[in-house]
Amino acid sequence: MDINNITAVYFVGAGGIGMSALIRYFLSKGKKVGGYDKTPSGLTEQLNYEGAAIHYEDNVDLIPDDFTDPAKTLVVYTPAVPEDHSELCYFRGNGFEVMKRARVLGEITGCNRGLCVAGTHGKTTTSSMVAHLLKQSHVDCNAFLGGILKNYDSNLMLSDKSDLTVIEADEFDRSFHWLKPYMAVITAADPDHLDIYGTPEAYRESFEHFTSLIRPDGCLLMKQSINVTPRLQEGVKFYTYTGAFDAKELSTFNFQLSTGSPDFYAENVRIGGGEIFFDFVGPDVRIPDIQLGVPVKVNIENGVAAIALAWLNGVTPEEIKHGMATFAGPRRRFDFHLKKENIVLIDDYAHHPAELKASILSVKELYAGRKVTGIFQPHLYTRTRDFAADFAASLSLLDELILLDIYPAREEPIPGVTSQIIFDAVTIADKRLIRKEELLDVVAAEAGNLEVVLMVGAGNIELLVDPVKQILDKKE
């Protein structure tokens, strides 16, 4: 099926952040768009407002007539939807073209110069930085992002003058293997999604295969410490980068490199007064006094990768400095909700032990000497089972921990796997395990003792951020 010739697109699992970018894309092309999701959300309601027709019951009778012609309708689904889903089975049994989200994204972007950002963590922020740097410059771009970029209040950007397309390359279910990168970034390859991959080795191999897809006239930019062996086609250039970030020594920025100097890096890093500045250094380029619009330490390495990709595609040093300073970040990626003298509230999407550690260390560096309280909701039973000890080690870096129940997402419970196995291994004394429904009462009771609060997780903890903010905002 030629995607350009269809008149209607139906999404099964329409509420996912990646699906929503495709929904917005097809709406912009004048297609009729509908779909199903399990639960309503602010995002699905916004998509309905923009012209989609999304319902919330798995019921074939609710599929509108606009989406019942197999010759004119494309059906897009996400791997999170179970195979026995009634609507999905209806479409498969009646001659419809049914494609995974990742394949459709690959079809849409395959003819463009794709700037694909992959990695266990850091990919949403880095791809959003790249998109903003290009969009606000003379270069311009299209973008399909995995987060709502606050500068544009969207995860989709379109351009009528540029074929550069920034793509968040998702490794879940090997989705990024459908892409055809012109340039690619790998920010991290810490094993994750072991329910899909089985072993850490298989997970890393998927990234190695991803590097083999880069066009011969393109390049790979990879964080230096990553344990991935690229399989590049002849002609593909290879660069390394680092953020000059030593997580073991909070106050020290240095390089402990075993493989030589990186091609791109930060130096002369200055942190203070809630701001971060650094100098960007690369082959034949040095840009002094870069200011991070989202001043958190982990964004130094994200920023180096984004600046390098922008510079390689013609963005000027002046445009880079302006873009980095004005970057507001994607929602739920180090998202400041309160930033007052007596209380700070940050919401972050971290849901893997490595990114959780980076988030906590970044907060402790930015607010040295102040008590940091973490409110963490584990995401998925399998991830909790596979990384319980690592989660506990990261959470033990906090001054105080409030741990919530596991958010199951697509999974059924696993016997013996609860937040308790993380809680028992956390080594700090100031910790408590509560149900999500108890959180607001706990925060209200403890508000006077809270200084810096970090709410973390990829589940529905985000629904509690505003209520927590309302409580803390009243703190004297």
Sequence positions of predicted segments:
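Short acidic/histidine-rich motifs immediately flanking catalytic phosphotransfer sites
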Residues: 68-74, 163, 449-451
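Phosphate-binding loop of NTP-binding sites
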Residues: 25-31, 62-67, 79-224, 228-237, ...
